[in-house]
Amino acid sequence: MSDSGTPAQARISLFVGKGGVGKSTLASATAVCDAGAGQRVLVVSTDQAHSLGDVLGIAVPPTGQGDPVRVLAYDPEAGGGFLDALALDTLALLEGRWLHVVETLDRRFPGSELSSIAPEELCALPGIQEVLGLHAVGELAAARRWDRIVVDCASTADALRMLTLPATFGLYVERAWPRHRRLSIGADDGRSAVLAELLERIRASVERLSTLLTDGALVSAHLVLTPERVVAAEAVRTLGSLALMGVRVEELLVNQLLVQDENYEYRSLPDHPAFHWYAERIGEQRAVLDDLDATIGDVALVLVPHLAGEPIGPKALGGLLDSARRRQGSAPPGPLQPIVDLESGSGLASIYRLRLALPQLDPGTLTLGRADDDLIVSAGGMRRRVRLASVLRRCTVLDAHLRGGELTVRFRPNPEVWPT
């Protein structure tokens, strides 16, 4: 609840990871535990595979109407919460949103002919379904019906594309048709006015999404991995990508970890393949975790055991996290936060420095660019537009270097615009 007594906007928890690591299971388990702790929780699937209902053990049919299924509810008088589930049908979302937009714009601009474009034709536009799914999650959080929205995202590549599209779309729309030009379109140019109004609506929506995603108080990512080398390598890259995008990582969950009894000597085993396999897998998993520590540091981990039975249904899911243990350590790498200071000099002889922490990014993929008042940072297939501090907007770039995961860009004043 907020100070005014009205429900606060729900926190959004994004469960991200490689396909098959157990995102749906751990997202559902987290939602079940939060509901049991008295919270009003909604778990949402944006993955078109939609295995959420399979994990929860109930039917959760995909829908574009935003009508959730009640999974469980505890006694509210005893402080219990409830859990709802929703599988987003982004194709149905697209159809509903497009028909609403056409109806609204047709009233303002009769004869626009937007109604001649079928929603099915828009499906070919890259990323439109992902953006609509993310927009729907934002609307659900703003509805204040729940305290927490747990999002079961698609596999890593699709999830990262979903998270980067709002900022990317806004960037290219502004470059292709700047806002001041769009707003100067006269009413006599009906077709251009319709297009300008449509883009303005989209721009406002994606701008709100970009702002929401980088609000660490409301949005966080939960990175799920298994103790396997290929999966761990992708998780490390994902950490860097999320940091570059400005999304706060709340925790790393290592799923399907074989339980090891410290009081048992695993080297003295009966001569049977099952025992040898178990001991070898434990050793491999331990080696993967050691390599992970060497790469990202002693980061806190949630260690989820590999159970004999598949956890399906609220009771089993709640027990899964009850059996997990937390390994203490440092917080995951934080999102990109620019730090600006004066390195030396004064006036036109000043040298200013912009520092950005870029953890777990491949230096060979790092490129920089500048567009007006923004610094464009690209790495590992991701791109982030960083608004420069006011003092740096009147400067030109002197040089840049990357050392130990920290990017330093130096600036010198531009005599043509520097105040005298």
UniProtKB/Swiss-Prot annotation:
Belongs to the arsA ATPase family. One of its GO terms (molecular function) is ATP hydrolysis activity. Pfam families: ArsA_ATPase (PF02374), ArsA_HSP20 (PF17886). This is Protein Rv2184c. InterPro entries: Anion-transp_ATPase-like_dom, ArsA_HSP20-like, ATPase_ArsA/GET3, HSP20-like_chaperone, P-loop_NTPase.
